[in-house]
Amino acid sequence: MPYIQRAITPILKQRVSTSKCMLLVGARQVGKSTLIKHEFKDFNRANFDDRLTRMQAKEESKLFFLNNPQPLFIDEVQKESSILEDIKQIVDESDERGMFILSGSQKLELMKGMSESLAGRVSISELTGLSMREIYGVKFNRHFIPTDAYIKEREKEIVKYDNIWEIIHKGSYPELYDIDRDWQEYYSSYVATYLERDINELVAADGITFTKFLTAVAARTGELLNYSNIAGDVGVSEPTIKNWISILERTGIVYLLQPYSASALKRAIKTPKLYFRDTGLACYLTRWLTADTLKCSAVAGNMFETFVVSEILKSYSNEGKDYRFNIFYYRGKDRNASGENEIDLVIEEDGVLYPVEIKMSGNPKASMGATNQVLDKVSDKKRGLGVILCLIDKKTYLRENLVALPIEFI
């Protein structure tokens, strides 16, 4: 399988060269180990998926570091987080940079551990599945922000995405871009590995029930998070569902998009929206077995929206930026039948709010951006250019402050 160059590589190299310790987080099989082995060949490697390695790190840490000298890459470090105290001691006794690279698939858990043990000593980055830019070899690596300057710069490197539904269905895990990899077999193995290596260590749930839960969540990608509704489908308590959702979030399977809130928007809904990080995994769990059936299905709109949101998040993480405090959605409690009290995404940057609509349409209308004016109520922010990301062929202004963009502009 040929190595696909990852967009975040220059960011990681810069951070390794300037910090004593660098943490790379991301879901299983997004390519963390492959990237580190390919780009940081001088680092020794220890994998905490291996129980004997973990045991030595826990019980005989001095011997562990003698057997695994720096510069050292520790994979799946969350499986033995006690090692962080030893790493803290080592980095505090040295002025060297680039001593440790750590990786793991439990993002929030790891970030908590780092803040407790390695605060101020570690640089944190996130690796996601392949972006469309990476799949198509686009070198442009700025986060999506619908300014005139961004659109003009992005337009210079546009590549047409001819097989968009094939990629939505396939998903973004790098191994799937090996021409011989069977889609169903890959995801069957992925789910089994996820249950065995991650879930068994985090919850006391049988595999069948948790898989039923995964399927119920996948069927709701792009929807407001409703714990009670999922609990009814799975047959477990609502507190259990809340705990399990938090585990999916921690392990990079789902993302909870928070609502935009401001004192001027008193009627805004406060519930997060739930998105699967990978559309291929969501398709597998909900049994959409071909791209053609998915494209024509009742879930096509939600799956398309999930894909676009994921691509925007990737554009941030691939530039080394934290998107959690920039990207939101808005929905008012007085939502009407035409949906004119809802904005799919609100992107905030430098005191400007950019309303973004996501439409599975090749013929967008100006009315699709009708809710944008609600942001004018936020007096301490400006409203920026409104955007409709859709399946249109070329950039088209629908009115002076609203533009329809092909998804290739992400």
Question: Where are the regions a protein language model picked out?
Answer:
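Short glycine-rich substrate-engagement loop in P-loop NTPases that contacts/grips substrate
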Residues: 43-71
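Conserved P-loop NTPase "ATPase switch" module shared by AAA+ and STAND
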Residues: 67-83
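Conserved catalytic/switch belt of AAA+ P-loop NTPases
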Residues: 85-108, 115-117
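A short beta-strand-to-loop transition that corresponds to the Sensor-1 phosphate-sensing loop
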Residues: 102-107, 113, 128-130, 390-392
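Short regulatory helix/loop adjacent to the ATP-binding pocket of P-loop NTPases
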Residues: 108-124, 138-140
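Interdomain hinge/linker elements that couple catalytic modules in large macromolecular machines
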Residues: 137-303, 307-313, 317, 325-328
